[in-house]
Amino acid sequence: LTNSLHNLGLLLQSDFENAHIHFILRSTPSDIYIEGDEKQLSQVFLNLLKNSMQSLEGKTDGQIEVTLEVTNKLYIRLLDNGRGIPMELQEKIFVPFFTTKTEGTGIGLSLCRQIIKRHGGNFYLQESRQGKTIFVIEWPVASFILK
């Protein structure tokens, strides 16, 4: 999982640089393995990173931070310092085909949630306000291996 996220960061590195976005990946421990469909999980993380990038459009000090933390569960937090999600829209963002964008279908976050649930995890918005949005993916201990 850590390697996949690192590779996505490398894949998007020129996009991050062109958009003045600083990408940070923090993982303790460094090697975490999840049994599942690597393509689907990569699709989830790519979608979340792209959404964060869109929320940072026009900023010159954009930051996206992905943190992997193991306690009684594996927590993956994706934080950005973008424009945030208005309170009145926060309940709607996981509804299929809901979008506020002029482009796109509005299935991204709904699809992400479905994929994570199929892999035994949970996916939710922890916090969003102007200048800070945090999405969380959590997996129970039985779903991952530390090496």
Q: Model regions: which residues?
A:
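Detector for a conserved hydrophobic position within an alpha-helical segment of the HATPase_c
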Residues: 116-117
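Glycine-rich ATP-binding loops of the HATPase_c
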Residues: 120-126
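Short beta-strand/loop element within the Bergerat-fold HATPase_c
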Residues: 61-73
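A conserved beta-strand-to-alpha-helix junction within the catalytic ATP-binding
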Residues: 1-10, 67-68
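Conserved micro-motifs of the catalytic ATP-binding
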Residues: 33-36, 100
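Conserved catalytic submotifs in the C-terminal HATPase_c
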Residues: 17, 22-32, 69-71
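Short helix N-cap motif at coil->helix boundaries in the Bergerat
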Residues: 84-92
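Short alpha-helical Gxxx[C/S/T] motif in the catalytic ATP-binding
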Residues: 108, 112
